[in-house]
Design a protein with these regions (language model features):
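Hydrophobic core segments of alpha-helical transmembrane domains in multi-pass membrane transport
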Residues: 34-49, 85-93, 109-121, 150-163, ...
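Short, membrane-interfacial amphipathic segments enriched in basic
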Residues: 1-21, 60, 167-175, 210-215, ...
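Helix-loop-helix hairpins and the membrane-proximal interhelical loops
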Residues: 22, 30, 36, 46-72, ...
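Alpha-helical membrane segments and immediately flanking helix-loop junctions
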Residues: 84-94, 108, 112, 278-349, ...
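Early transmembrane hairpin of solute transport permeases
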Residues: 20-172, 345
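Membrane-interface helix-loop-helix junctions at boundaries between adjacent transmembrane segments
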Residues: 103, 121-234
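Transmembrane alpha-helical segments and their short flanking loops
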Residues: 2-18, 53, 57-69, 273-282, ...
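Membrane-interfacial segments
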Residues: 48-51, 55-56, 94-102, 165-174, ...
Length: 450
């Protein structure tokens, strides 16, 4: 039995049941609301970090030294409010599926509840002064990708509370003459009060704990253990597994995990650069470039192989069009259009290859470099947007072996993703074919037409 047949017979039926669950669908559909904004932001990100010699100097000469900061304005405006958009979108989609509560009211209430979980203060330390707490501000990190997991939980919780209260008829109904928009607002009063009361209790409970706030609790529970495993092969494997799992749950795995192990990687990179400049053996394999350029071709999950199949082998028009949209980003190692476009978030079909592929690439790449078959990263800092093959050559200090390893890794990505891509593509093609079939019309008797 082929791999594809095995997947279609055993994996797909279970995946269909999971994927059809209301809450799973709502999370996926709600997060997709970010996609057009992130696509726009990704193009500006590419232009800000084009890996062309002399490009940065040219732009500085034309637009000034701060040109890149200004180019990143759209990136910050699109990427940094992901959790806000998702909190509204998930609740809206879940309310749509229940059909018993107003989706717009549910989305707005979820947004309010999510904002209420965020501490509205931040610690500010002047250059020549003492640290002080600034009140009345919302940290951008809390409403961006780092707050996405909290947004998912709160949006599902608030909508379920809203539905439960409304189903008990604990609502204020206005007379028939009141405009519908006003009537819906009053219907949301009591359910909304209950939602905020529960979320307030949750926030107070977490604030009474050593964590202080919900986002800090997640960062502490996940991040501190990762700090102790930074530069080892087992630690690297654990890191990419955790990153992948978090992404499939809708949480920005890189933003959470890398913030704790990046200091180790950057320190290794600095030591590698010193050794490279002095003509000494490179001491470390695992650095920031090792992860960015060999483990994540096409972005987190090594999605470049999947994008290639979508461009060249898709029978589904949806997959083919998404491949065309995601290809420029994948070429520059930006995976968000794929993660939120297919989507890979809460998608059991792609859970296994999304986790397995980076693990295999870590093992293969580490072994190749440890045995001397491939030159390790020389400590040369390259932006993560540097395209494959160019990056392999530059990061190793001009060794062809870096390119060869990237070819091998891309091949592994193609092999692992292929059966899952084929099964998903067949499913989407069948759905498109079914939706294209003419619907049977029902001819009513003359008496029923009046």
């Amino acid at each position: 039995m082929s791999n594809t047949s095995w997947i279609e017979r055993y994996v797909m039926p279970a995946a269909l049941k999971i994927a059809g669950q209301k809450h799973v669908l709502s999370v996926r559909d709600g997060i997709i609301l970010n996609m057009p904004f992130m696509l726009i932001g990704s193009f500006f990100l590419i232009f800000a970090y084009l890996p062309i010699p002399g490009y940065a100097d040219m732009m500085s000469g034309l637009f000034g030294e701060v040109w890149r900061d200004k180019m990143l304005y759209p990136v910050k405006a699109t990427y940094d409010i992901m959790a806000l958009i998702s909190s509204f979108g998930i609740a809206y989609r879940l309310a749509e599926k229940y059909r018993t509560i107003d989706p717009l009211s549910a989305g707005a209430m979820s947004l309010v509840a999510f904002v209420m979980t965020i501490p509205q203060n931040t610690l500010f330390t002047p250059v020549h002064g003492a640290a002080e707490v600034i009140k009345g501000v919302i940290p951008v990190s809390m409403v961006g990708s780092q707050g996405l997991f909290v947004a998912i939980v709160i949006s599902l919780l608030s909508t379920e509370i809203y539905r439960l209260v409304a189903s008990r008829n604990l609502v204020i109904r206005m007379p028939d003459g009141v405009p519908p928009a006003v009537a819906k607002s009053f219907l949301a009063l009591i359910p909304g009060f209950c939602v905020l009361a529960v979320v307030l209790a949750l926030r107070l409970a977490v604030e009474a704990s050593p964590f202080g706030d919900i986002n800090s609790m997640i960062a502490t529970l996940i991040g501190i253990p990762m700090h102790h495993v930074g530069g080892t092969l087992p630690g690297m494997i654990i890191s990419v597994i955790v990153i992948g799992i978090l992404w499939t749950l809708g949480l920005h795995g890189d933003a959470i995990v890398l913030v704790f192990i990046q200091p180790v990687w950057l320190s290794n990179m600095s030591e590698n650069l010193t050794a490279f400049q002095n003509g000494q053996p490179i001491p470390h394999i695992i650095t920031q470039q090792f992860y960015d350029l060999w483990i994540a071709p096409g972005g987190t999950g090594a999605l470049l192989g999947l994008v290639i199949f979508m461009l060249l082998r898709s029978r589904s028009q949806q997959m083919k069009q998404l491949g065309k949209i995601a290809a420029p980003g994948a070429l520059f190692n930006i995976s968000e259009p794929m993660v939120f476009g297919i989507p890979l978030v809460m998608n059991p079909y792609f859970f296994l290859p999304f986790i397995l592929t980076p693990v295999l690439l870590v093992i293969v790449s580490y072994t190749a470099m440890a045995t001397g078959l491939v030159a390790p990263p020389a400590g040369i800092a390259l932006p993560f947007t540097t395209p494959i093959f160019i990056s392999g050559y530059l990061a190793t200090g001009g060794h062809i072996s870096g390119i060869v390893l990237q070819v091998v890794n891309l091949t592994i990505s193609l092999v692992v993703y292929y059966p899952f891509f084929r099964a998903w593509d067949r499913l989407k093609a069948k759905e498109e074919h079914a939706s294209a079939q003419p619907q049977e019309s029902v001819i009513l008797p003359d008496a029923d037409r009046a």
